[in-house]
A protein has these predicted regions:
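Intracellular juxtamembrane helix-capping segments at the cytosolic ends
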Residues: 145-159, 167
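Hydrophobic core of transmembrane alpha-helices in multi-pass small-molecule transporters
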Residues: 115, 129-145
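Cytoplasmic loop-to-transmembrane helix junctions
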Residues: 73, 162-169
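Extracytoplasmic
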Residues: 36-69
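Conserved kink/hinge residues within transmembrane alpha-helices of Major Facilitator Superfamily
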Residues: 52, 56, 88-93, 148
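C-terminal ends and interior cores of transmembrane alpha-helices
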Residues: 110-126
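Central cavity-lining transmembrane alpha-helices of secondary-active solute carriers
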Residues: 76-94
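Cytoplasmic membrane-interface "Motif A"-like loop-to-helix N-cap segments
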Residues: 98-109
Length: 170
């Protein structure tokens, strides 16, 4: 997405011209598009936050359903999504310019189904090894990385004077 002043070309859903700092453009077209992207991003991040924090709710209940993990192992399962999320934030912040905001938001939100479904199967079998839970926990960290790409995406759409409010809602 460029901040160019070149004439707009019809190219389907791809934005070829974006001038959020131009008040006329912002009123006529920009605000509507920016708001739509913000309101799509907010529920995607809500879902991401739920997946990211999933193990904080699951870990305390694993011993109650028959898993024999130590307290240290349970704390590790709770901490690993934060670790992988922090490490993945750097590459995720570069994905929006590479793939586009809508594509990346859809993809990065969609892949969160993998750790959720896998965890759903894993907790049903008390013989599931701890190493499997480690992998699932690390995959939940992908949800934490979504925040970096979402901030990069939404900041492109809003003029400087409105970015604080938009990013605060996001």
């Amino acid at each position: 997405m460029s901040h160019s002043s070149a004439p707009e070309r019809a190219s389907g859903a791809v934005i070829t011209e974006w001038r959020p700092e131009d008040p006329v453009f912002w009123q006529q077209r920009g605000q509507r598009i920016a708001s739509r992207n913000l309101w799509i991003s907010v529920p995607c991040l809500l879902l991401a936050f739920c997946v990211w924090m999933l193990f904080s709710a699951v870990a305390v209940n694993l011993p109650k359903v028959g898993f024999n993990f130590t307290t240290e192992q349970l704390f590790m399962l709770t901490a690993l999504p934060s670790v992988s999320g922090a490490l993945l934030r750097v590459p995720y912040s570069f994905m929006v310019p590479l793939f586009g905001g809508r594509r990346w938001t859809a993809f990065s939100t969609g892949i969160l189904i993998v750790p959720c479904v896998w965890l759903g199967f894993a907790v049903q079998d008390t013989t599931t090894p701890f190493s499997t839970f480690i992998i699932i926990s690390l995959l939940c960290g992908f949800a934490g990385a979504n925040f970096a790409s979402s901030m990069a995406n939404i900041s492109f759409f809003f003029p400087k004077q409105k970015q604080g409010g938009a990013l605060g809602l996001n």
